[in-house]
Design a protein with these regions (language model features):
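Short, electropositive alpha-helical surface patch
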Residues: 191-206
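N-terminal amphipathic, basic helical "cap/leader" segment at the start of enzyme domains
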Residues: 1-133
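Small-aliphatic-rich amphipathic alpha-helix that forms the alpha element of a beta-alpha
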Residues: 48, 67, 94, 135-191
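Short, surface-exposed helix-loop/turn micro-motifs enriched in polar/charged residues
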Residues: 86, 180-183, 199
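A short, structure-level motif marking secondary-structure boundaries and short turns
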Residues: 25-27, 153-155, 204-205, 210-212
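Beta-rich nucleic-acid/ligand-interaction surfaces
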Residues: 82, 87-88, 186-193
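Solvent-exposed coil/turn segments that connect beta secondary-structure elements
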Residues: 99-100, 142, 212
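C-terminal helix-cap and adjacent tail motif
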Residues: 4, 32-34, 202-216
């Protein structure tokens, strides 16, 4: 669907997900992440970039596992994560939009839990490339976890946490030969409606991840 069509449907409150493609498993157990290897940090930083042309090939499960762990997985026995959050609130959740459905990443169990058995990729971004890329990450703040943070500061703190997560994804993509782009121009109301979010949850950002499109 074109960008203009999405914007028009969004203005009318009619931007809706498509039916799921394939079987929607209620949960997906991810393989243990490979936390060793990769390219040196300085090299990953030199290769970090935003790309907007994606192959349609789905990411193998081990790659998805490593990606989500790098983004915001648990890296310490005490439950610490790979990205910081103010007062360790860990208020940002990662929703994974796949052709078969939208899933919530559970870092404690390192698995995905089905949220809605629909293809949300049309909804998760205005850009036309989002529809066909195999994976979109949606970052959502859950402010019920922010009781120690002043109300007027919660949104800013959540965006800082989400920004750190997106940079982790960028660096993993650079290290793994993937393409990614972070997007703030999204229909937050349509995404929240499609995922059935509660009033205390706020859609922050969306990030497409895929193999880069090969041009001939």
């Amino acid at each position: 669907m074109s960008t203009l069509s999405k914007v028009a449907l969004g203005m009318m409150g009619r931007l809706r997900p498509k039916p799921a493609i394939g079987h929607s498993d209620s949960s997906i157990k991810l393989p243990s992440p490979d936390t060793h290897g990769g390219i040196p940090l300085m090299e990953a930083l030199s290769q970090r970039r935003s790309l907007r042309e994606f192959a349609r090939n789905e990411l193998p499960l081990p790659v998805l596992s490593n990606l989500l762990w790098a983004a915001y997985g648990r890296n310490r026995p005490d439950g610490g994560r790979t990205a910081p959050s103010a007062l360790n609130a860990q208020e940002v959740d990662i929703f994974v939009a796949l052709p078969a459905g939208a899933y919530l990443y559970d870092a404690s169990e390192h698995e995905l839990h089905l949220v809605v058995a629909s293809d949300l990729r049309r909804v998760t971004g205005y850009q036309d490339f989002v529809d066909d890329a195999p994976l979109d990450l949606v970052y959502v703040a859950d402010y019920t976890r922010c009781s120690l943070v002043a109300v007027e500061s919660r949104e800013a703190y959540a965006f800082v946490c989400a920004g750190a997560i997106t940079q982790n994804v960028y660096l993993f993509a650079a290290s793994s030969g993937l393409a990614t782009v972070i997007r703030a121009w999204i229909d937050r109301a349509a995404i929240a409606d499609a995922m059935g979010l509660a009033p205390d949850q706020q859609v922050l950002l969306s990030q497409t991840v895929a193999y880069p499109k090969v041009t001939t």
